């Protein structure tokens, strides 16, 4: 029984799904997808639970969420192993994900009060008040790269605001989704407040097509996000929050410490085997001898990166990709770039057939035209050289995406220029592109999305503002507008 609907664990009525470790092939989880009828059942359960959940005090909802945080802490080792085994990422990185889940809860509580709490302004004849109200029933679609942390970036603020939820994890990480849901169950959520439906495309389409949804919160690829946007077009009554991918530029303008700049670049491009939406996909490197030296050092250090199993000792920097298919897609993308005229500096290699262990790749594309503006979700870095900083900014902005952007330079003036001209939601200076503060908004513009999940601004799309003018009594104004006559004399 792998679906949680209305407080009960039930068996899916859809197709059988089997999840294997992407490196060893070990069977980790199996269960049946939710069919359309079960998706509808989950929605009805969420709708029935909504009035009572929304009417609880914020403190009562907070108690449950903080209880969940405590369960994350006490089950950290077990959840770390589940996430690592299912995604293929190393144990150390999965542990940081669980820690982020825990830390984000206190931040979400504070964000609710600061961004969507209550305000009151006294007026001579009463008061003006601002309150926030939950939308109702929300669908949450989770990604596979951070199957615990990123869905919770939607779920926690949505629950705090008083919404009820239908959660569909990625079909590639059903085990992590179930493990997190069992902790929510232990936290004492009332039946129907949070429901779990497992499945792939058919389940997702059934969920997004529900008429009784009040909104949909999504983290994932731009292609799927665009499909959801089209599906919900013409329905302004539904909130749609999209956090999608990026074709992110990292500008290396000048680096006094080449090794430090190489370290920053590797952290930006290859951490999580390149499976972060903020990863650097495009390296924009200043022409000249220093750029040549940097590039040679980057290739030399990157070729030492050997992906390993989740529990290898010593621990590897990167593990496998989410699947063998995902790894092969990166190799195919590299081969296509070579065919277009790219010059391979470091070829990505599948270490073992039937696994997702893929070494990083670096390819120079300077002078090549017609390069697709797409996100290759893996450890593949494309390099372009530029002559001046204005050209670098133009190249950085030459994308339909707008998630993250970074600059390596000792010059504050150049960073100030980038802040003014960059089209990206995250702009870092001498910091990895993959670094983001949990107390800051997370997200981008253009094809990268429309709202800011998993952090400070998530509260904004989980509740709607209600403005009120209030007075505890009603009296006739001392001064009336022209044309109004409330005298006792009857005019005939």
Curated annotation (Swiss-Prot):
Signal sequence interval, chain numbering: none
InterPro entries: Ald_DH/histidinol_DH (IPR016161), Ald_DH_C (IPR016163), Ald_DH_CS_CYS (IPR016160), Ald_DH_CS_GLU (IPR029510), Ald_DH_N (IPR016162), Aldehyde_DH_dom (IPR015590), SuccinylGlu_semiald_DH_AstD (IPR017649)
Binding site for NAD(+): 220-225
GO molecular function: aldehyde dehydrogenase [NAD(P)+] activity; succinylglutamate-semialdehyde dehydrogenase activity
GO biological process, one term: arginine catabolic process to glutamate
Catalytic activity of the protein: N-succinyl-L-glutamate 5-semialdehyde + NAD(+) + H2O = N-succinyl-L-glutamate + NADH + 2 H(+)
Active-site residues, Swiss-Prot/TrEMBL: 243, 277
Protein's job: Catalyzes the NAD-dependent reduction of succinylglutamate semialdehyde into succinylglutamate.
Similarity annotation: Belongs to the aldehyde dehydrogenase family. AstD subfamily.
Protein name according to UniProt: N-succinylglutamate 5-semialdehyde dehydrogenase
């Amino acid at each position: 029984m792998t679906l949680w609907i209305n407080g009960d664990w039930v068996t899916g009525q859809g197709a059988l799904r089997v999840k294997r470790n992407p490196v060893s092939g070990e069977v980790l989880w199996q269960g049946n997808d939710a069919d359309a009828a079960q998706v509808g059942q989950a929605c009805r359960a969420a709708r029935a639970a909504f009035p009572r959940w929304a009417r609880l005090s914020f403190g009562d909802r907070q108690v449950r969420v903080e209880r969940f945080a405590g369960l994350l802490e006490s089950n950290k080792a077990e959840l770390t192993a589940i996430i690592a085994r299912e995604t293929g990422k190393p144990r150390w990185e999965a542990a940081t994900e669980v820690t982020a889940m825990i830390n984000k809860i206190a931040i979400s509580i504070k964000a609710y009060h600061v961004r969507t709490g209550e305000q009151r302004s006294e007026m001579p004849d009463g008061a003006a008040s601002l309150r926030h109200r939950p939308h109702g029933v929300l669908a949450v679609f989770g990604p596979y790269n951070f199957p615990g942390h990123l869905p919770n970036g939607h779920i926690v603020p949505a629950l705090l605001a008083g919404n009820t939820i239908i959660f569909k994890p990625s079909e590639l990480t059903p085990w992590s989704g179930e493990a997190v849901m069992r902790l929510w169950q232990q936290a004492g959520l009332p039946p129907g407040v949070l429901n779990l439906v497992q499945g792939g495309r058919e389940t997702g389409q059934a969920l997004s097509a529900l008429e009784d949804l009040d909104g949909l919160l999504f983290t994932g690829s731009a292609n799927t996000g665009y499909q959801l946007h089209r599906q919900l077009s013409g329905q302004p009554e539904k909130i749609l929050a999209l956090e999608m991918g990026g074709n992110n530029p990292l500008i290396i303008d000048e680096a006094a410490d080449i090794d430090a700049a190489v370290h920053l670049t590797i952290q930006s491009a290859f951490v999580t085997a390149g499976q972060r939406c903020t990863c650097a996909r495009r390296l924009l490197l200043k022409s000249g001898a220093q750029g040549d030296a940097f590039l040679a050092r980057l290739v030399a250090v990157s070729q030492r990166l050997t992906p390993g199993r989740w529990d290898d000792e010593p621990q590897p920097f990167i593990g496998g990709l989410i699947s063998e298919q995902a790894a092969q897609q990166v190799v195919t993308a590299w081969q296509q770039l070579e065919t277009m005229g790219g010059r391979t500096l470091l070829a990505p290699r599948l270490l073992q057939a039937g696994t997702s262990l893929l070494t990083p790749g670096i390819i120079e594309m300077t002078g090549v035209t017609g390069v697709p503006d797409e996100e290759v979700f893996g450890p593949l870095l494309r390099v372009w050289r530029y002559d001046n900083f204005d050209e670098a900014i133009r190249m950085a902005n030459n994308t339909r995406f707008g998630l993250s952007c970074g600059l390596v330079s000792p010059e504050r003036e150049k960073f100030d220029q980038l802040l003014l001209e960059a089209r990206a939601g995250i702009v870092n200076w001498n910091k990895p592109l993959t670094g983001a503060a949990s107390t800051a908004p997370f997200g981008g513009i253009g094809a990268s999305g429309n709202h800011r999940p998993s952090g400070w601004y998530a509260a904004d799309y989980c509740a709607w503002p209600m403005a009120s003018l209030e007075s505890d009594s009603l009296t006739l104004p001392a001064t009336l507008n022209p044309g109004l006559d409330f005298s006792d004399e009857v005019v005939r």
